[in-house]
Amino acid sequence: MKRIATKVCACACALALAASGSAMIGCSGSNSGNDGAQQGATSQQAGYTFTDDLGNQVTVSTHERVVAGMGSFANIWELAGGTLVGASSDAFSDYHIESKAEKVGDFSSLNAESIIALNPDFVILTGASSGRGGGVAQTDLKDALQSAGIPVAYFNVTTFDDYLRMLKTCCDITGDAEAYKDNGTEVAEDIDAIKKKAEGESAGSVAVLTTYSGGTRVQASSTQTGTML
């Protein structure tokens, strides 16, 4: 039962990213020509080095104290076998993370001082190009965090494939291969089995709209919901 619940959680995480993508531009963005955060990743004696979705080379020497800037990212990190010392407020309200972590602000307006005060080993952020409702883009925190000697990685996650790529990188960092199998490859196999049931079936035209406090947005085929349809 625990295994089933975990796999359902992994699927739910990928679905929730679609909603997050409609609120923050960076989550629904492309990989900027990067074939994946795990590509170019190398294991080194001094830590684990990989290239994030914005093309930055990141080395994580230890991962005992990690901060996640989005609830969905906090969830992915825990699914990869990691624990957190800090996370955005939605990690607690929407994802109910298990880690005993501190809040570091809303995902659209993270507090750099709160993050640095936690003395993190590694910070996971979204590669957003702008904030929401006048908020601060998470990419704007890069210089402050790096000046404090804190490794920071940016991920662009919208579809399940994006989730799978990020999960693989996180599992490589934590060294938990079993977590990737349980929450990654086995979930992918379940999705493929469902897709095969729909092969040969006719499909109509669908318009998907997301309404939030800032207005209404049409979901494109590149979003998680569009990909599912």
What are these regions (language model features)?
Residues V85-I173:
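Acidic/His-rich segments in extracytoplasmic proteins that coordinate ligands and/or metal ions
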Residues G71, A128, T211:
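Flexible loop residues that form catalytic
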Residues G47, N56-Q57, D140-G215:
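Extracytoplasmic substrate-binding proteins
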Residues M1-I25:
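Sec-dependent bacterial lipoprotein signal peptides
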Residues Y48-D53, V58-A91:
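Extracytoplasmic strand-loop-helix segments at the start of, or within, the mature domains
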Residues V60-E64, M70-E78, A112, I116, ...:
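Extracytoplasmic/secreted envelope proteins and their assembly/folding machinery
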Residues S89-S93, R217-L229:
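Alpha-helical, coiled-coil/dimerization segments enriched in small aliphatic residues
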Residues S22-T42:
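Bacterial lipoprotein signal-peptidase II cleavage site
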